[in-house]
A protein has these predicted regions:
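A short Gly-Trp-Pro
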Residues: 1-105
Length: 105
């Protein structure tokens, strides 16, 4: 699943906002999803309240967003291999929003 990050003030639901549901997915954040079908939409982490991570697949034109790296490569299903030359990180990038390679406890 491809995610992109934007400042919270730039994130706007253009339709279907009444169908969005939220749940606490970890000790450090929550996720939003479609209440009708369960499609994952976005996530927010408590230590970065000014940022929203959202699924690129939810965009009307997802091809306008190009990936810059892969995270959690150690969890990749062995038969799924991409042929790009993008950097791969076992977990988070070390500079991912100050997480230093792992989310806080």
């Amino acid at each position: 699943m491809v995610f992109a990050s934007v400042p919270e003030g730039d994130f706007v639901w253009t339709r279907g906002a009444d169908r969005v549901r939220r749940f606490k997915s970890s000790s450090f954040g929550h996720r939003e999803y479609c209440g009708d079908c369960g499609t994952p939409f976005s996530m927010k982490v408590d230590h970065q309240p000014e940022t929203v991570d959202f699924s690129v697949a939810t965009l009307d034109d997802p091809e306008r967003v190009a990936p810059g790296f892969h995270i959690f490569d150690v969890s990749r299903i062995p038969w799924f291999e991409t042929k790009d030359a993008l950097p791969r990180h076992a977990r988070f990038r070390k500079d991912t929003r100050g997480l230093e390679g792992t989310p806080p406890d």
